[in-house]
Amino acid sequence: MTSKLTGFSPRSARRVAGVWTVFVLASAGWALGGQLGAVMAVVVGVALVFVQWWGQPAWSWAVLGLRGRRPVKWNDPITLANNRSGGGVRVQDGVAVVAVQLLGRAHRATTVTGSVTVESDNVIDVVELAPLLRHPLDLELDSISVVTFGSRTGTVGDYPRVYDAEIGTPPYAGRRETWLIMRLPVIGNTQALRWRTSVGAAAISVAQRVASSLRCQGLRAKLATATDLAELDRRLGSDAVAGSAQRWKAIRGEAGWMTTYAYPAEAISSRVLSQAWTLRADEVIQNVTVYPDATCTATITVRTPTPAPTPPSVILRRLNGEQAAAAAANMCGPRPHLRGQRRCPLPAQLVTEIGPSGVLIGKLSNGDRLMIPVTDAGELSRVFVAADDTIAKRIVIRVVGAGERVCVHTRDQERWASVRMPQLSIVGTPRPAPRTTVGVVEYVRRRKNGDDGKSEGSGVDVAISPTPRPASVITIARPGTSLSESDRHGFEVTIEQIDRATVKVGAAGQNWLVEMEMFRAENRYVSLEPVTMSIGR
């Protein structure tokens, strides 16, 4: 798909143009200075056209200086239907772009097996996407980009930094989403598109086949609508790409400064890509793009409050002069050509994780640390916690540390006063605080009619039921509270205290006995006693 109407690839055309440039300079030098002038002109021409300076020839740097920092703006996506199912598509510059949100497997545990290694079965092998670039009737995609974005912890308040220190050095994502962005070129598929209703409908059908293929592998996937495409671009920094605050080394948007780096060809591997989630940044955007010729590229965009002075890793190369184009390559639009990026052959395996790592619970019997997600991007989640306050409050504040906005609905606000923080609200009404993503309620047994006061019931009830209901709700009960089998099936995650610091965790059909990790830095959030500051003398 890189060939042009001339029949030559862009690289061949540039090589021919470079030879002609050197020839013209040599001829001019010969006319002005004879043999010495010709030799000097050839040396200067080769240095300007062919010699690599910091990864690119001098003429390429000149082009970036003149044209690299331009705002990138696209048409609005539209909604089209195919096979009685609708989806969003953007047609821009001869390319139709569609997207699929990869939801993966719900509530799958992540185990920390070492100081820099984690294990999870909620993953996707990018190499397996290569066959999905070709479709019936010789329809071929330009590329598929696997865009993963999120952050290790929250960015508001003091506790997220404490939680980050508790996690330590392993790769961890408190928030993480994965999207597949597919680009269908029109000119390169002229023959195949003759048999299609429209370019947009053909792109929608491609996205539907990709989503169906992923579902057959047990990975939930959802076709994006036009609203989803626009919202995804906004979250990935479309304001920075379309704005004028563009520097040579970074671009600025409403959420902060964005700097994009390229992975060298020899560094693209599963282990290296996972290390992106060790970075302390407001947000990390990782982009792995697969091409039909079995090659790939990888970039990482880091969002920080101020421009990053140096790359976060020695293996990363900053894409100077083309930061806006590099950030636009993460979005739902035509993929721009990045001069500072080189393709490499696909490795035998290139695994990347899907969804958040989860909330830190504690240690297993073999010494591994267990993390369980309490939220899910695709479905509503219910979590049951039967434990005393020293454990229940730790779980709640760790959800905040992971980046969620929590609202506690309680009639006993003094009980929860110690956990109050910027991203955790305590209310006594059913209406949650604005932008709440996780609700916390207290468990109360339903009493039978004519009961003599004993708390025996037939079902789960809560003291205050949040309305409207957040996507995830955590129900807090006293230790020893038991659930009937029917009620237990209503919860995706259960955490039950069986000893002073031991809990039984159940999620996704699996069960673990975990020793809860009690960090001293969290004591001020779980204690009922007021915390005072002492001034050293």
Swiss-Prot record:
One cellular-component annotation, GO: plasma membrane
InterPro entries: EccE_dom, T7SS_EccE
Keywords: Cell membrane, Membrane, Transmembrane, Transmembrane helix
Presence of the UniProt keyword Hydrolase in the record: no
Spans through the membrane: 31-51
Membrane topology: Single-pass membrane protein
Disulfide bonds: none
Signal peptide stretch: none
One Pfam family here: EccE
Keyword Flavoprotein: no
Subcellular location as annotated: Cell membrane
Assembly and binders: Could be part of the ESX-2 / type VII secretion system (T7SS), which is composed of cytosolic and membrane components.
Family the entry assigns: Belongs to the EccE family.
UniProt protein name: ESX-2 secretion system protein EccE2
This protein's encoding gene: eccE2
